[in-house]
Amino acid sequence: MAKKIVAIIKLALPAGKANPAPPVGPALGQHGVNIMAFCKEYNGKTSDQVGMVIPVEISVFEDRSFTFVLKTPPASVLIRKAAGVERGSNEPNKKNVGSITQDQLREIAQTKMPDLNANDIEAAMKIVAGTARNMGISVKD
């Protein structure tokens, strides 16, 4: 029989740098999960993506064991990296802070495809382009 899930915890952590300090410690500790075991496993699986923020969904079971699923980095992080800017515009409709090309947009959409609710790459590109526009980053042809 399958183990019963007690909680699902969603966190966005820097790749390869999870440690027992907040936010990881308190989130897992209240469910009785072995925090160090999670940190070691997470850091091991994300060590090749250092510098990115990787969302993770942790399922905690009745016997305090856990499994986790890594998601793709947030679109905003990928867009900022592609545009080479530190942060998005504070007035997105008035002031542009950078731009990305169609090729970069397609690459980001392909990376995000598993987590996006889109049927094809064109729809995914529109979703990512909308995110970029809301950050004050234009998409060049």
From Swiss-Prot:
SMART domains: RL11. Forms part of the ribosomal stalk which helps the ribosome interact with GTP-bound translation factors. The lineage of its organism: Bacteria, Bacillati, Cyanobacteriota, Cyanophyceae, Oscillatoriophycideae. It comes from Gloeothece citriformis (strain PCC 7424). The keyword Disulfide bond does not apply. It comes from the Bacteria. The gene is rplK. PANTHER family: 60S RIBOSOMAL PROTEIN L12 (PTHR11661), LARGE RIBOSOMAL SUBUNIT PROTEIN UL11M (PTHR11661:SF1). Belongs to the universal ribosomal protein uL11 family. InterPro entries: Ribosomal_uL11, Ribosomal_uL11_bac-typ, Ribosomal_uL11_C, Ribosomal_uL11_C_sf, Ribosomal_uL11_CS, Ribosomal_uL11_N, Ribosomal_uL11_N_sf. CDD domains: Ribosomal_L11. One or more lysine residues are methylated. The keyword DNA repair does not apply. This is Large ribosomal subunit protein uL11. One of its GO terms (cellular component) is cytosolic large ribosomal subunit. Gene3D superfamilies: Ribosomal protein L11, C-terminal domain, Ribosomal protein L11/L12, N-terminal domain. GO terms for biological process: translation. One of its GO terms (molecular function) is structural constituent of ribosome.
